[in-house]
Amino acid sequence: GPVIQYGSFRHWIYYLAASKNISSQKMGKPNAAICYVLEVYGILRNKRAFLQHGIITADLSFLYYPHTKMSLFVTSTYDEWKYVNDRYGYPEGYVQELGLCRFDQLHDMKVKKNQILIMPTWRMYIRNEISASDHELEAQKFMETDYYRYWDALLKDERLIRYIEENDLQIIFYPHREMHRFLKYFHVDHPKITVASWPEYDVQTLLKESAVLVTDFSSVAMDFAYMKKPLVYYQFDNEKFRQSHHQIGYFDFRKDGFGPVCVTEQEVTDWLIRLHKQGFANEEIYLERHGKYFDLWDTKNCERNYKAIKEM
């Protein structure tokens, strides 16, 4: 369909005139600061639906009702719904368990049995503290971060490289879009390891076609778990992440997660090798957790969202 240029005069006209604003992002507005005042202080009296772009597991205070005044907050599981409904302060009926629209497409996938996807999330403190204006200083500061050192070390792990060579495996490294400006510092020269970026690679396609996922705290783990595929959480900086990015919520990765939690590259490599020797088959304990957590598991997510928005 037709696309309106972001931040343009036309964007403002449509934004102000619309009776309903539907977005997967809280910040999907012509100007975040001005629109915050218009919406939160009741100047703009439209209905706003927050479709979300991932299942919430952490305590995201910026999504509390006093900071959004959204009319519909979409959740995807009972546990997520209960957490948001009980904690975020929304009026009764505003938080609904409908499922992410994109989940409809996750039931139709063709998996590449030899593809390993490494997809970590971003770090707020890295993005905010490292200036992009000075290239040399940016490179120096980024390459001093644990984020760079740990992920770079995993991509260059000799034992992992030897194993993927011997078994014709392929690794795709695609971090969160907020980190793509730093991709140029990951110097990986190997035909079986690809440092991928948008728009050359589509996130949902990578998730659907990959046999196994290595991530950290990213909500893409939920998409992968939804498809009943094996994954591992590489959480080498858990304490700093909780202090500087997102605080812990209802979800305990070790007790509730859909894969093991590792803190060293050796543990990740060990797990990948062991899993491959098992044919990349998911373990029963994680399949059982899938059945308990995803109480909505069908292709009617878009339908439920559509009906809820019409009734909003």
PLM features: what roles do these ranges have?
Residues G1-L106:
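Active-site and donor-binding regions of nucleotide-sugar-utilizing enzymes
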Residues K20, K47, L72, Q115, ...:
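Structural motif
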Residues P30-A33, W81-V84, Q105, I126-R127, ...:
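Short, charged/polar "capping" segments at the starts of alpha-helices
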Residues A33-G54, H135-M143, K229-K240:
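A short, gly/pro- and small-residue-rich
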Residues P91, F186-H190, F217-Y293:
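Catalytic binding pocket for nucleotide-activated donors in carbohydrate/polymer assembly enzymes
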Residues C101-Y185, C262, W297:
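Conserved catalytic-core segment of nucleotide-activated headgroup transferases in glycan assembly
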Residues R177-M222:
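Donor nucleotide-activated moiety binding/catalytic core segment of transferases
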Residues D298-M312:
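C-terminal alpha-helical cap of glycosyltransferases
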